[in-house]
Structure formats: C-alpha cells, structure tokens
Regions:
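Acidic, metal-coordinating catalytic segment for phosphate/diphosphate chemistry
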Residues: 1-30
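Conserved Nudix-box catalytic region and its N-terminal flanking loop in Nudix hydrolases
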Residues: 31-71, 75
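Short aromatic/basic micro-patch
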Residues: 49, 97, 124
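Nudix hydrolase/Nudix homology domain
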Residues: 44-46, 115-164
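Active-site segment of metal-dependent pyrophosphate-handling enzymes
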Residues: 74-111
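Short, solvent-exposed loop/turn segments that connect beta-strands within catalytic domains
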Residues: 28-34, 93-95
Length: 164
C-alpha cells in the first residue's frame, strides 16, 4: 500500500557553515591600488588566493582574520575593515555551502611579506591583474566588491575594526 506524500517529496538539506574568513590586503588607493595574492603550496596547489583560513574556537571572525594575516604573511595589522560581504562556495567533499566573512586590511609600501609554508610565492598586483590570476568566479566577484568599495576610495569608517 502506498501512503500519500504530504507536502511533496522528502527533501535533503545540506548544511551552510561559517567557519573561515577571507582577507584582502591592499596597498595604495585608486586605479594603481594593489592587492596581495599568494600561490598555494599544498591544498589547491598552484592556485592564487588572498589570505584565508579557519576561525579557531573562542575567536571572533575579525580576530581570526588578523591572526591569519599574521600567520600567512608575517604582517601585523592595527586596523581591519569589515568587507561588508561574504564569500560563498559549495564544497562537494563536505556536502555543504561555506560562507566566509570578508575583511580588508591596508598595508604601507615598506611592509615586507614573510610567507608561511602554506604558500610558495606572492605578488602585489593591480586588481585587473588579480582578476585574471585567481581561479574561482566567487573570488573574482568578491574582489570586484573589494576593489569598488575599498581600493577606489577610502572605506566607510563604520566598517573599521580597531585591533589594538
């Protein structure tokens, strides 16, 4: 005997999780502004990316962003901005959608980058160069927002997060 299906067929949900952050570092302002890209040495080997990483237990997203910048580049930021956007993508191996709040940090020309072992190369590039170099469409969409709202003109002060 077939029982009637109420409210349509049974559906399978997939999880949506937020356990990581994405950080764009910017040098300069206007059309000549540059962003830091790093080449991955292990996971997704050979692809270029911005700073990204996990939120550790007990951390806020902005604390994780500052820590990841320090770990991956050796740069200690005094201020970070909420990017006012989330990067999102589907992870088939985990059957989930990942959301990552985006943050932005500004770096002076004299600041030196010191990579950890997650990356084997870095380059400061203009935003058009960065768009051409990154692999994923979601990165490009997020980068376009960051360029428009943070590199072409000073950001809104209400997005500022003071770290010290």
């Amino acid at each position: 005997m077939n029982l009637p299906v109420l409210n349509g067929p049974v559906k399978q949900d997939i999880s949506v999780t937020c356990d990581g952050v994405s950080v764009f570092l910017i040098k300069g302002m206007g059309r000549e502004a540059q962003t830091l890209l790093m080449r991955r040495a292990k996971t997704l080997k050979g692809t270029w990316c911005q700073v990204a990483g996990s939120i550790e237990k007990g951390e806020t997203a902005w604390q994780a962003a500052a820590r990841e910048v320090r770990e991956e580049t050796g740069i200690t930021l005094q201020t970070i901005w909420s990017g006012d956007i989330c990067e999102q993508f589907y992870e088939p191996e985990k059957e989930r959608i990942a959301l990552m709040p985006v943050f932005v940090g500004y770096v002076e020309d004299w600041v030196k980058v010191r990579l950890n072992d997650e990356h084997d190369a870095f380059e400061w590039v203009t935003f058009p160069q960065a768009h051409a170099r990154v692999t994923f469409p979601g990165q490009r969409r997020t980068m376009q927002h960051v360029e428009k709202e943070f590199a072409r003109h000073p950001p809104l002060d209400m997005l500022r997060i003071r770290l010290s």
